[in-house]
Amino acid sequence: MQAFGPPNEGPLQGLVASRIETYGGRHQTSAHSTAGNLFPRGGPGVDPSRRRLQHYVPFAKGSGQTRGMSPLVLREPDPEKRHGSYFGVGPPHSPKLKEVTRAHELEIRLHTFSMFGMPRLPPEDRRHWEIGEGGDSALTMEKSWKELVLEHKEMNRQLCHQQEALWELLTTELIYLRKLKIMTDLLAAGLLNLQRVGLLTEVSAETLFGNVPNLIRAHRRFWEEVLQPILEDTRTSGQPLDPVSLQNGFLTFGQRFQPYVQYCLRVKQTMAYAREQQDTNPLFHTFVQWCEKHKRSGRQTLGDLLIKPHQRITKYPLLLQAVRKRSPEPRAQEALNAMIEAVESFLRHINGQVRQGEEQESLMAVAQRIGPYEVLEPSSEEVEKNLRPFSTLDLMTPVLGVAPEYTRQLLLEGPVRVKEGREGKMDVYLFLFSDVLLVTKPQRKADRAKVIRPPLMLEKLVCRPLRDPNSFLLIHLTEFQCVSSALTVHCPSSTERARWLEKTQHAQTTLQKLKGEQYIQQKRELLALYRNQGTESPSTRPSTPSPSPEDSQSSAEGRTLEFAIIPRLVVTEDTDEDTPSMPDDASDSGYGTLIPSSPKDSHSPLNRLRSKALRRDPRLTFSTLELRDVPLRPQPPDPQAPQRRSAPELPEGILRGGSLPRRAPPIWSEEEDETLASGNVVVETLHRAQRRSPLPHSPTHTDSAGESPWESSDEDEGLLSPELRPRSLREDMLREIREELANQRIDGASEPEPGNGKPRRLTLAQLQRMRVPHIIQLDTPLSTSEV
């Protein structure tokens, strides 16, 4: 019969031929036959003697061996199928055939992934996409908190509800972590493995899932450092979960989950990109469907997985509020309030960043609608060439004088007619932004409008309504508040005019408020910077901002009143060895001037500076001191140089007529005491003073005026040569010692003979009596003023 002839010998006829045509003969091929073929690109050759049987196997009714023989093994692929064609038409390298071949190869790859699992990524991709391989064993929990808490049956209802709320926080954290792993271990890993063999290379895995690994790492650290320890404590002790243990972890919520800022900024673009790829890319749509049907996906769609991070980060305050509602203890309430505030503060930060990003995108879209900047008509090509670098308007620049996070916004736009001077009306299109008004003219052949007038800054703009209900006047001022330009704006209706005036006035008010807030914020930051520098500075000068003239005057008056009265003191020392020496802040060594009006226990830095300064200068030992010679606030050029301090304040007991406290014995030996009987007491006293306090040879320190406080001025000592100054100092000290000794009333000492200016020599007994406490005698106070 002709029907049993070779398949390639003319058209087939008869019943068998019709069956062959129906089930896929040489003239028609079904997609299922090619899809089920193990050798679509040409496999092992088939014995020519068996080629005639390959089309008749499905209808054979012979033995069981023949019935069980697979037609895929006996059938030889058609020549067209060796090129990957489903339909056997067209050249093998046409775009349609390539697409069909890629779809078939994608199905084979996905089937291989289902059978043998997802291949591991290459080493260059593992570092970013693989998170904690083998570390998921710690991400396990019991089915209920009652398995951990031993005495859960004896707990009251409110405490049980608290444990349920805490358990919900822990369980939802693990569930969310597993959903994040679906995106990296299934979707991202599958896409990257397909791209390694040349499939879906046009899809960006970084755009879809680039920030997800950072989210997983953040949540794993949060689980290991915050949530898992409280779970382990309950497992060990059997006590209920303590919400206070979560406080330290949630107080650092913002630092832990910084990757959410970037993710939330890009989530809308990511979801739009995923929808676009599914709608326009059949291969990607096939891949996504395979992933959604995978057993690991849990019937989660790609859109559901991409929106999960945004939903999770906003759910933390609700979970903590549920725990707080069921925690009556004040300690737990306080801790939970702090945790909720930390989380909500971070969410406000994210919302601000998202809002700023949306405003930036909106401004960019508006900026693309505004074309060239042609506010001048150049007179020549040379002029035009020089104007070209300055003929670009960039609306993306920040607004001047406001916080950097504030973005310029488009408030109003619309067509109007303007008139400038005596010229006729012109149709323009106005753009009202947060800080500027643009006058543009639409272009017929383009969608962009060109700027025809210089930008009108709102802070220099004045709007005045005119008698015409549809018109108002725009006046632009200079820095000198003079008119720069004026435009008469004619709106289509009175409603439009009212709308333009209202929006412009509101924008000006808002801009002024924002600039005021920014000025206050900058002033606070500057004051804080000054305070920080003052704290770190080693100088004794208090580091404060520059005071106003009124403050400086009041402070100077206060210091003048404090040191206005400086008494003359005649000081004697007690050298009793049995009396312990008093501390410097409660006694006077006789080297300084005590102030009667000072409080008893004054420990001001100025007094300590003066005390040290007086001890270092021997010329102040037996002389009356005037504070004008000692700067109140010295500024040594070397921070390591010794600082001058003030003299200690006069104790209250001294002010009431008491004696000075006793000091340590003077620096001389008993042998020197024996020599005093035959020596001159004035000379010996001067000798001891020079030995005890030699003139310092340290580098001279200068005060704020650039003068040395230890150098005698010309007004006090006159213009003396260096050779005469020591002698003058010696004579002054001798004269002052004579006056001090003359004012002392020593028991048992006879008055000196009249006419004899030299003091009489004292015996050892008289000298010992001089060492006992004596009453301080004050001379007439001297009024001094600070220079």
From Swiss-Prot:
Residues 161-353 form the DH domain. The keyword RNA-binding does not apply. It is found in: Cell projection, Microvillus; Cytoplasm, Cytoskeleton, Spindle; Cleavage furrow. Keywords: Cell projection, Cytoplasm, Cytoskeleton, GTPase activation. Residues 409-509 form the PH domain. One of its GO terms (molecular function) is GTPase activator activity. GO terms for cellular component: cell junction; centrosome; cleavage furrow; cytoplasm; microvillus; spindle. The keyword Ribosomal protein does not apply. InterPro entries: DBL_dom_sf, DH_dom, PH-like_dom_sf, PH_domain, PLEKHG6, SOS1_NGEF_PH. Residues 533-762 are annotated as: Disordered. Gene3D superfamilies: Dbl homology (DH) domain, Pleckstrin-homology domain (PH domain)/Phosphotyrosine-binding domain (PTB). Residues 535-557 have a biased composition (Low complexity). Residues 724-742 have a biased composition (Basic and acidic residues). Its main location: other. It comes from the Eukaryota. It holds the Pfam family RhoGEF. PANTHER family: PLECKSTRIN DOMAIN-CONTAINING FAMILY G MEMBER 6, PLECKSTRIN HOMOLOGY DOMAIN-CONTAINING FAMILY G MEMBER 6. Interacts with MYH10. Interacts with ELMO1 and EZR (in an open conformation). Interacts with CSPP1. Guanine nucleotide exchange factor activating the small GTPase RHOA, which, in turn, induces myosin filament formation. Also activates RHOG. Does not activate RAC1, or to a much lower extent than RHOA and RHOG. Part of a functional unit, involving PLEKHG6, MYH10 and RHOA, at the cleavage furrow to advance furrow ingression during cytokinesis. In epithelial cells, required for the formation of microvilli and membrane ruffles on the apical pole. Along with EZR, required for normal macropinocytosis. This is Pleckstrin homology domain-containing family G member 6. It comes from Mus musculus (Mouse). The gene is Plekhg6.
